[in-house]
Amino acid sequence: MSEEISFVKEIDTGVEGLPKPEVKIENIVATVILENQLDLNLIETKIQDVDYNPDQFPGLVYRLESPRVTVLIFKSGKMVITGAKSINQLIHVVKKLLKAFADQGIPISGKPQIQIQNIVASANLKVYIDLEKAALEFENSLYEPEQFPGLIYRMDEPRVVMLIFSSGKMVITGAKMENEVYDAVKKVARKLKEADAIIGIAE
């Protein structure tokens, strides 16, 4: 099983008569805050696979191949991580990075603080959707098909933004925890059923 496939999760919405949607975490953006400042010149000389061009960008760019994740490292001790596909993978990357620092004698003090900034996910409800009907029933939604083919739905709880397409495909952004993604998909499936906006099962 490839790394891509392993991050697809089938969830049970509890909605009778509907297939189980597939949900995939596409990208997690997180900041990691260390308690001490970092010597970026030292890191550049000690760690492989880093790019540091302070004239172009104030941070150091560290690219990992497995998992395929990018880390921006700043002198202040702040790091920005993009590309993780799960919280567990994100934590693994942080541990891997701190171990690389320790192995090369780069000082790190205290325990890092990890803050999730955004989780982006895709989902397939495996149904066809009447977006006009959904737009009438969904509060805080926008559907202007002449400008964009999907319905934009701003959910209050969990606080996420969803792009919903007539094919049953969706994009979810703004989540801070993986469970918020799954809760949002379950909730929107129920709302679509209640709105009578599901017009067929996708094969």
Curated annotation (Swiss-Prot):
It comes from the Archaea. The keyword Metal-binding does not apply. InterPro entries: TBP (IPR000814), TBP_archaea (IPR033711), TBP_CS (IPR030491), TBP_dom_sf (IPR012295). Keywords: DNA-binding, Repeat, Transcription, Transcription regulation. GO terms for biological process: DNA-templated transcription initiation. Sequence repeats lie at residues 25-101, 116-192. It holds the Pfam family TBP. PANTHER family: TATA-BOX BINDING PROTEIN (PTHR10126). General factor that plays a role in the activation of archaeal genes transcribed by RNA polymerase. Binds specifically to the TATA box promoter element which lies close to the position of transcription initiation. This is TATA-box-binding protein. It comes from Aeropyrum pernix (strain ATCC 700893 / DSM 11879 / JCM 9820 / NBRC 100138 / K1).
